[in-house]
């Protein structure tokens, strides 16, 4: 497990830029132009076994004890080189040692260099046996990477592993720029551990010291090390001033932790954010525990609750053991339904509506797999809203392909549904689904014929409260058996032609597709809907055999789905254009018997569902993607979206977007506790744009703006300005995003955030602008259209 830490400890600045190629690679190359490189042949082996070569204008000595060299003195051994106006060589036989101790004193214009460092000063000393070197009142420059400084005394120790400075300074800025530096009474640079340790450290911006610490660490590479990371600060309207001081703990090669005290002025306390990562034989995972001991804002809004401990726990795990066992955890739980409205977290959002807690253990061998899982939901919309959990659920699959010309599969499921409310129906559901398929295909087409039997048994309990409610149209039954056969034939052809007349080298395909699906009607009004919802119907979704997800609602079908796709490929076999259009024609009404489903009372047949998708790569820099779905059962366009993008490179792009979802579609597809929320009563109708652009040398700007035409209000706004150099990077950003809905005042709640971040450069291999990461972090994230 590898974690890169391009950070400076406790310098009261923050990092928000991440690595990219393109412009980042160009900047890295430019920065290295100001860094010296080792240009002599690299010598390997034991340096003490290598000869010492001395060149000078004049030499005199008392052999074998000492010698004096003057005038352009140049001493070389292995990769080390010492130059000076005068060098005094001393050789002394130590008692009990086979080799004499050889030292040199250098005076005047002393210059020492090897493949790691360059030292310069008026006076120097070196031990030719141990390669220990001292240079007084000089400066140093790291070789092959950024890093330089000055010191009263500079020492090389441990076969050049350590550079030790007394009253020294360090900066990664290139020569000629001292924008920032760290000065200490002692500085030890450990090349093996890739760290610089500094005692009595003063962090300076230009000549002005702004921070003091008795001890600091500077990482000078990408190696994982325990220590404080770069702090971060920002201002938001919901928390006012916020300050982060993360500490990274490198526990072991296979596990680490990041502990972050997060001060929030408006909350009047510190939230402790604790992230733990691990890698074991059973898999890899991440745990997060965030804890706020008290929250004065929440306590003022909820005085009856008293002191409120607010927290988040997140656990993600995925792993395989002994090649057959599979373990997965996806668990998120928070202290209260307002948590994600009040606090930003990468583990959840105020727009999610719920948090999932799922555990699963699976076993898989050839032709067989089984999974036992539990799944619960924490709903944020309303504390009185009910939700179902699967406690537990067993899924089993058995495959036997190439059984003659047939492929076969048997799927089974057993699940027990429990509701968060005591008066809601609960059930045990057992489902068995054998399938036989006859696949036929060649290079120009395919025909798949499939038959299956879906047998489901329900044992429902706690029905009295539901059945006695006059508002419920359906009456539930204690025991229900439902058996439904299904037959499907799906055929596809691929025609191809050369477009030599219109576009030489280009190829066009025409791909018609026809599917017939038959499922007989079964009245399911006696079954409560525990886990079914309407599935989205894009072009590919037209050819699904299910209208609803889950098993509680399986709609009857006597329908033909037709569609056609055409694609255009260039002479390099790159897809430049495609468009797909399809429809579902119902010979008989699609029904489940559930009177709560509005359109089942309309008795509609014919062409009810249409869908189309298109993609056009106009050029290497321009791309268009669009889709629309029309459902006559909803009497409206269900969803549509379009995206036009111009991309010059990784960090220079402009994208225009349109998103639409009808209120009828939202009510049909989302759970009632979410779809009936005030902010969705008119559906979603948004236009917006995202952009990232290099506006000048090393300056870039990023922005995003989405406007909801239904409410005539912005949905999301973000603007960021970045400067990137070899020495440091700066980002100033503003964001205004939707953060919930005030039911009492009937208006949206927005959060405004202003951030100012700085990163010291040259301490690692990171030179990226990070513009796409900024765009993807939005509440409406950027997705490429290319």
UniProtKB/Swiss-Prot annotation:
Compartments, as annotated in UniProt: Cell outer membrane
Q: Does the keyword Protein biosynthesis apply?
A: no
Pfam families for this protein: LptD, LptD_N
Spell out the disulfide connections: 31-726, 173-727
Presence of keyword Membrane: yes
Endpoints of the signal sequence: 1-24
Q: Which keywords does the record carry?
A: Cell outer membrane, Disulfide bond, Membrane, Signal
User: Record's GO cellular component, any one?
Assistant: transporter complex
Outline what the protein does. Together with LptE, is involved in the assembly of lipopolysaccharide (LPS) at the surface of the outer membrane.
NCBIfam families cross-referenced by the UniProt entry: PRK03761.1 (NF002997)
Protein's name in the database: LPS-assembly protein LptD
**Native organism:** Salmonella choleraesuis (strain SC-B67)
* Lineage start: Bacteria, Pseudomonadati, Pseudomonadota, Gammaproteobacteria, Enterobacterales
Q: Which gene encodes it?
A: lptD
